[in-house]
Swiss-Prot record:
Biased composition (Polar residues): 1-10
Reactions catalysed according to its record: S-ubiquitinyl-[E2 ubiquitin-conjugating enzyme]-L-cysteine + [acceptor protein]-L-lysine = [E2 ubiquitin-conjugating enzyme]-L-cysteine + N(6)-ubiquitinyl-[acceptor protein]-L-lysine
Pathway annotation from the record: Protein modification; protein ubiquitination
Native organism: Arabidopsis thaliana (Mouse-ear cress)
Pfam family, one: zf-RING_2
Family annotation (PROSITE patterns): ZF_RING_2
Protein name according to UniProt: Probable E3 ubiquitin-protein ligase RHY1A
GO biological processes: protein ubiquitination
ZnF region ranges: RING-type: 203-244
InterPro entries: RING_finger_E3_ligase (IPR051834), Znf_RING (IPR001841), Znf_RING/FYVE/PHD (IPR013083)
Amino acid sequence: MTSASELFSTRRSRPGRSDPALESDTSSYRHHSHHHHRRHGVHHHNQRHDSDGCDPLRRPTPRLRRFFHHPIQERSRPIRDVQGTSQYLNTDSTDTETQSSSFVNLNGSERLPGAVLLARDRLFERLRGVSLSSNSRSNRVSLDDQRESSFHSIDGDPIFQLAGLQVTYECNKKPQGLTQDAINCLHRQTFSSAEVKSEMRDCSICLESFTKGDMLISLPCTHSFHSSCLNPWLRACGDCPCCRRAIAKE
């Protein structure tokens, strides 16, 4: 025990000198460690060489490396425009701009002054009135055209032509008016309730009832009228006002 303690104290008292056994152990450890790192480095280099040379699909692109080395760009996304160039835009800023633009588009009309809104409403009303008036005018023109075409078709119908000719003939065929002498030759009588039938007690010209003492004119068709009412009619037309029977001239 004494020799061991002396040896230990002796080694501690000489810091500048090293133990050959310890140096050999340290050198062997360093050599083993250097050899291990070298082999590991060669193996890692071979793996990189194999990954870069043999499998091109596993080779990371420079863009991905740039993303890996710069984490601040992970929030950016590439946007390819029409010409094919790549542009990196920030996602947060793009979303914010989109929301702001949509907000402006939605609230653009609400931000207009009141006078502008009123003017726009008046313009819309005028345009609507112009469109309605043009539509009504076109409809009116189409109705007029239809009426004219219907009238032309009626005029061209032979049946209506014959009817018109018949009416014209009847009008032209009416008897001429009577002279005053012919009127004076008609049968006259004084009204008496006992002599006249009940259904013939009204004048069909003035629509008044006969009274006792009225002077009446009785035509050949047995219709009786006030003489004052029938005289103008007979001077204009020589037929009965009720049945349109011609009065024979004597």
